[in-house]
């Protein structure tokens, strides 16, 4: 099949997971469209080159703030259309939970979109302090999470400062503290209750919903809260009903089921006399990381408009059936707002090609296991391929055991491997996925016979969910996509940890154990993009092997082009050492003592001292200059 732009899109499933923000251009480069297909197209290799010319180094995080605004606009437009279709007059507010990515360049950009259609959510005291500064006057702030008196006091101060803060009661003990602090400050609090739904959305994050959820009130506890408030000056303060169906909900039916249950809570609270003006449905809107449009954990089987409709319709029907005032619908879809806006770019530093295998010459003292392997290779065209592979596996294992017992030497051990790889490649050429009986062996061979692409980044720092929960992220070369990839490889990071390997890849609308990649060219960079990393990854990343934050740039649309709006240097080695308790002055003193004790010339001492200082203040990652 002739390689083409369409085939590049299909191979990496780009058109499905990209959601209109990324594609391949005629030059074989990945391009980003920050404001959608009708806007400017920006070449990712061109941006990386411009950032490097300005001093940035790889690995490099590219942020596209215009995507944040565009995603928010699409979310608001979807709910506007759904409310129009269902004749729902309650309105809609998209709340951003800043735990998804607290960076000022993310939360601040979203917060700059003024109006009733946007709000912020905090789940801790530091996050609350941030949103109190970011929110517009009169802006909606949802206060979730565990709370002590200081947290509650700060939220109430927000009310006195003209912000619409709502303290969501998630534990029965919180209500008493809220009422006491409100009385002390002389302010009427904005109150909400988080109800714990029995409905459970399937997926990796299902424990955030359902009866076993960490947060939320049981039906009895909800009634107890209302019993305390009813008939007091605070009764009219209970305005928010909040719930959470789960995060990254893959199946739209789970959303529909959760909304049916939640709507009953809204109706019952309203009939009891609570003035519920806002229904906060929490998160749940998923991202199709896989591009498979399915119910698997890292995909979704619905679109944005379907999501909005499944939220609006039950509330619209309930308000009509029970003659209730439609509440304002609030969502906390942080993942959907932010995932697309960030791309990590890293360079391949080296490739370890899978051995092709060979048939060694016959020697007089050849062990029986080597002779058997040689005979198997000679029968590749005469016997069933699968049968030969299983025999080769048997004798290969027998040879390894013999070597461990000292019965064969290293030379013959290497010959066994050579023959096994030669047989494996020969068997794979004779198998086809069209034959159902071939698939198990073919899958095993495809997983075994792959190159290792060593990439200048840390899985644990930049895409920690790959290690923690087997999260899928699309990975695509950002250039040479006008050439057919001729190798299959796995991506390995820089860390001294076998978990620093990506094990699943998006390919041809499914998942595979390896990724189609190109052969490296001497003296030419080969750069790979890790896409949809804008949600959670920066915040969850750790410092395994003391690899810290990468360099980052913000790339803003400027007319029909772009500009690098902001550049942030990543962590240097001295910053990482200081973070884990090293006294840098002492480190430098020890270096100086050892140089003096070595008895070198002044010139050599100066040169070594300069190199040590450069290492101490340098970027922890490898050089991004391609090897000659």
From Swiss-Prot:
Cofactors, names only: Mg(2+); pyridoxal 5'-phosphate
GO molecular function terms listed in the Swiss-Prot or TrEMBL record: arginine decarboxylase activity; metal ion binding
Keyword annotations of the record: Decarboxylase, Lyase, Magnesium, Metal-binding, Polyamine biosynthesis, Pyridoxal phosphate, Spermidine biosynthesis
Root EC class: lyase
Binding site for substrate: 279-289
InterPro entries reported for this sequence: Ala_racemase/Decarboxylase_C, Arg_decarb_HB, Arg_decarbox_C, Arg_decrbxlase, De-COase2_CS, De-COase2_N, Orn/DAP/Arg_de-COase, PLP-binding_barrel
Biological-process GO terms, alphabetical: arginine catabolic process; putrescine biosynthetic process from arginine; spermidine biosynthetic process
E.C. code: 4.1.1.19
Catalyzed reactions per annotation: L-arginine + H(+) = agmatine + CO2
Residues modified as N6-(pyridoxal phosphate)lysine: 99
NCBIfam families to which the protein is assigned, alphabetical: PRK05354.1, speA
Purpose: Catalyzes the biosynthesis of agmatine from arginine.
Family named by the database record: Belongs to the Orn/Lys/Arg decarboxylase class-II family. SpeA subfamily.
Protein name, per record: Biosynthetic arginine decarboxylase
Protein source organism: Xylella fastidiosa (strain 9a5c)
């Amino acid at each position: 099949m002739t390689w083409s732009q369409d085939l590049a899109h299909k191979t990496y499933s780009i058109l499905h997971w990209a959601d209109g923000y990324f594609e391949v251009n005629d030059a074989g480069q990945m391009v980003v469209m920050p404001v959608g297909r009708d806007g400017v197209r920006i070449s990712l290799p061109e941006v990386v080159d411009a950032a490097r010319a300005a001093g940035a180094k790889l690995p490099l995080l590219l942020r596209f703030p215009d995507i944040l605004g565009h995603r928010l606009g699409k979310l608001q437009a979807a709910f506007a259309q759904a409310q129009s279709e269902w004749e729902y007059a309650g309105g809609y507010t998209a709340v951003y939970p800043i735990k998804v990515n607290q960076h000022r360049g993310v939360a601040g950009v979203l917060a700059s979109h003024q109006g009733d259609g946007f709000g912020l959510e905090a789940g801790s005291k530091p996050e609350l302090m941030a949103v109190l500064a970011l929110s517009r006057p009169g802006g909606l702030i949802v206060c979730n999470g565990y709370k002590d008196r200081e947290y509650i006091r700060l939220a109430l101060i927000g009310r006195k400062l003209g912000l619409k803060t709502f303290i969501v009661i998630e534990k029965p003990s919180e209500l008493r503290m809220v009422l006491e602090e409100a009385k002390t400050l002389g302010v009427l609090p904005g109150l909400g209750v988080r109800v714990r739904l029995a409905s459970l959305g399937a997926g990796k994050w299902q424990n955030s919903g359902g009866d076993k959820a960490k947060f939320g009130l049981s039906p009895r506890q909800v009634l107890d809260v209302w019993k305390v408030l009813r008939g007091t000056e605070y009764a009219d303060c209970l305005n928010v009903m909040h719930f959470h169906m789960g995060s990254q909900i893959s199946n739209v039916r789970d959303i529909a089921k959760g909304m049916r249950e939640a709507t009953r809570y809204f109706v019952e609270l309203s009939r009891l006399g609570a003035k519920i003006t806002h229904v906060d449905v929490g998160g749940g809107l998923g991202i199709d990381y896989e591009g498979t449009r399915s119910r698997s954990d890292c995909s979704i089987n619905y679109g944005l408009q379907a999501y909005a409709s499944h939220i609006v319709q039950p509330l619209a029907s309930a308000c009509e059936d029970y003659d209730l005032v439609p509440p304002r619908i609030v969502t906390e879809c942080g993942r959907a707002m932010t995932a697309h806006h960030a791309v990590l770019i890293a360079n391949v530093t080296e490739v370890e090609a899978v051995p092709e295998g060979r048939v060694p010459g016959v020697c007089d003292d050849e062990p029986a296991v080597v002779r058997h392997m040689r005979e198997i290779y000679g029968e590749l065209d005469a016997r069933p391929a699968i049968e030969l592979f299983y025999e080769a596996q048997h004798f290969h294992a027998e040879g390894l055991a013999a070597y461990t017992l000292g019965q064969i030497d290293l030379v013959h051990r290497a010959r066994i491997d050579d023959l096994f790889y030669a047989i494996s490649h020969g068997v794979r050429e004779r198998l086809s996925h069209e034959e159902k009986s071939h698939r198990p062996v073919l899958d095993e061979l495809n997983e075994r016979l792959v190159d290792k692409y060593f990439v200048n980044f840390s899985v644990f720092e930049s895409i920690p969910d790959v290690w923690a929960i087997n999260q899928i992220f699309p990975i695509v070369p950002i250039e040479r996509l006008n050439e057919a990839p001729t190798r299959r490889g796995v991506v390995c990071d820089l860390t001294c940890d076998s978990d620093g390997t990506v094990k699943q890849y998006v390919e041809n609308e499914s998942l595979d154990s390896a990724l189609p990649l190109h052969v490296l060219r001497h003296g030419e960079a080969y750069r790979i993009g890790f896409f949809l990393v804008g949600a959670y990854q920066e915040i969850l990343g750790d410092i395994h092997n003391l690899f810290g934050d990468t360099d980052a740039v913000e790339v803003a649309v400027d007319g029909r082009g772009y500009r690098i709006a902001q550049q942030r240097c990543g962590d240097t080695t001295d910053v990482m050492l200081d973070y884990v308790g090293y006294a840098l002055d002492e480190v430098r003193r020890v270096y100086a003592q050892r140089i003096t004790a070595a008895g070198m010339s002044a010139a050599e001492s100066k040169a070594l001292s300069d190199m040590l200082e450069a290492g101490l203040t340098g970027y922890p990652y490898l050089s991004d200059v391609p090897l000659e």
